[in-house]
A protein has these predicted regions:
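Cys/His-coordinated zinc-binding microdomains
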Residues: 28
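N-terminal [4Fe-4S]-dependent radical SAM core
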Residues: 1-23, 31-59, 63-65, 70-71, ...
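Conserved non-cysteine loop/helix-boundary elements of the Radical SAM core domain that shape
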Residues: 39-57, 77, 81-193
Length: 193
C-alpha cells in the first residue's frame, strides 16, 4: 500500500484491563501493555513513547514518513491494542474521533479544540492528510449486529478477526473460548453487513 501512496499508520489503544477480558494461554500479558502485545514491537514502542495518546501516535508516525521524503497525505489507520470490542464505548468513540482530529490538524501550527467524531470525519474530506480507512481487530465471537452498527458509526472500513485456529479441540486446549461456529457466524454477519 505504501508504494501506491498510502501510508499505513499503526496506533495502539491504551493498555487497560478491558483491552481483552479473555485468558487465552498463549497471549502475552506484559505489565502496562495492551493484551496480546509486547513492548519490543515498533508500534508498541511508539505508543508507549506517546503515552498511548492517539493524536500523538499519529503525528509521530506521519512525521517519520515525511522526514524520509515519503508522501504524507493519506493513510490507512490500523488500530491495535487487543479486542477493540472490549473497550468501553466512550473511550472507543473518543479514540476514533482523535484519529480524524490528529489527521485534520497535523500540519497546523496551532491545534484547535476537538469536535465530534462526525464533524472531524467531515472535515477530513478536505484535510491535508486524509484517512482512507480504519482497521480494527476483534474476536469473531464479539461480532453482533449491534457491534457492526457501532463499527459503521466509528467509520471502521476493515475488521481483522482473530481466528487463531479452526480445530475446536485445539481452541479448547488453549482456552480460546471462541470456536469455529463463532468464527463462521461472525464472518457471515460481517459479510452480510
Amino acid at each position: 500500500r505504501h508504494f501506491s501512496g498510502v501510508d499505513e499508520v499503526a496506533i495502539m489503544m491504551k493498555p487497560d484491563d478491558f483491552s481483552c477480558p479473555f485468558d487465552c494461554y498463549y497471549c502475552p500479558t506484559q505489565k502496562d501493555m495492551p493484551k496480546s502485545y509486547v513492548r519490543e514491537e515498533p508500534a508498541v514502542r511508539r505508543a508507549a513513547q506517546n503515552k498511548f495518546d492517539c493524536a500523538k501516535q499519529i503525528w509521530t508516525r506521519i512525521s517519520s514518513y515525511a522526514a524520509t521524503g515519503q508522501p504524507a497525505d493519506k493513510g490507512e489507520i490500523i488500530i491495535l491494542g487487543g479486542t477493540f470490542s472490549s473497550y468501553k464505548h466512550d473511550y472507543a468513540e473518543e479514540f476514533m474521533r482523535d484519529i480524524y482530529y490528529a489527521c485534520n490538524v497535523m500540519y497546523d501550527e496551532e491545534k484547535r479544540n476537538r469536535l465530534s467524531l462526525n464533524e472531524e470525519a467531515e472535515i477530513n474530506k478536505t484535510a491535508l492528510f486524509k484517512v482512507i480507512g480504519n482497521t480494527i481487530e476483534t474476536r469473531p465471537d464479539k461480532i453482533t449486529v449491534e457491534e457492526i452498527k457501532r463499527f459503521n458509526y466509528y467509520k471502521v472500513t476493515r475488521v481483522q478477526l482473530g481466528i487463531q485456529h479452526t480445530d475446536d479441540s485445539i481452541l479448547k486446549k488453549i482456552n480460546r473460548q471462541c470456536y469455529t461456529a463463532d468464527t463462521i457466524r461472525g464472518m457471515r454477519l460481517l459479510k452480510n453487513a
